[in-house]
């Protein structure tokens, strides 16, 4: 029997906690989830991070009395954080996603355990289409697309959210080296990083991950170079979060530039 379950109602348990109950269920259970509730199944709990902010947020009393308020707006939380608290949170907390070809998922899970050790992990399938020169910033490698036409391929979004294992064990977690290792592996695997997260790559490294051909052409045609910031300037972490002076100096010494221009 399939029952209807509006999992995103404010008084309901968080979706990931609801899913956990099925692990102990002796019988198979089928549910029908309305589309809007399914698409927003992680919204109320900010995936599973709200319990780190408000430990009792999944308590029935809290859900019934204050659940209708919804989750705090993350952008506003960042806005009111001072630079010291903001930097401390980055180096004691992980929010990262790597979108990799699905065949690399087993390796990605093992590496996420090495880099972050934060659980549970989010796993989302993503289909990426190969439109050739019109693909935009997400230009998949043809060998990762499905034969015979190679018009699209299946990637998977692997996400880690929470407190890294090293931090829980009272050790120092090197956020910069861990995230940069993830970024390097993602680029080599033909994947992409979610740019809402704290990035630790240089402008050149970002361009190696994403295809800026159409973006650069549009900026040049419309005169946007002098009017609007680069993509990197819009998504990079604030000053004081990461020091990339060594990496930028190494790129400069090696003569590496961004499309023939001096690296930023």
Give the label of every model feature segment:
Residues 4-264:
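Noncatalytic alpha-helical scaffold of FAD-dependent oxidoreductases
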């Amino acid at each position: 029997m399939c029952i209807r379950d509006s999992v995103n109602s404010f008084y309901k348990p968080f979706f990931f906690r609801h899913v956990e109950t099925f692990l102990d269920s002796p019988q198979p259970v089928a549910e029908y989830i309305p589309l809007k509730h399914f698409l927003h199944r992680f919204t109320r709990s900010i995936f599973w991070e709200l319990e780190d902010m408000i430990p009792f947020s999944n308590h029935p009393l809290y859900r019934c009395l204050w659940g209708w308020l919804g989750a705090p707006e993350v952008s506003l939380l960042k806005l009111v954080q001072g630079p010291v608290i903001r930097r401390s949170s980055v180096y004691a907390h992980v929010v990262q996603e790597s979108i990799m070809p699905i065949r690399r998922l087993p390796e990605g899970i093992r590496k996420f355990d090495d880099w972050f050790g934060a659980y549970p992990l989010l796993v989302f399938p993503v289909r990426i289409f190969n439109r050739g020169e019109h693909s935009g910033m997400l230009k998949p490698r043809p060998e990762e697309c499905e034969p015979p036409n190679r018009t699209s391929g299946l990637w998977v979004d692997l996400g880690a959210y929470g407190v890294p294992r090293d931090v829980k064990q009272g050790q120092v977690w090197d956020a910069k080296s861990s995230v940069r290792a993830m970024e390097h592996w993602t680029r080599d695997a033909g994947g992409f990083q979610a740019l809402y997260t704290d990035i630790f790559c240089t402008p050149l490294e970002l361009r190696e991950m994403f295809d800026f051909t159409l973006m650069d052409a549009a900026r040049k045609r419309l005169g946007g170079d002098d009017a609007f910031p680069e993509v990197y300037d819009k998504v990079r972490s604030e000053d004081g979060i990461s020091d990339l002076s060594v990496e930028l100096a190494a790129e400069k010494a090696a003569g590496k530039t961004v499309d023939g221009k001096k690296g930023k």
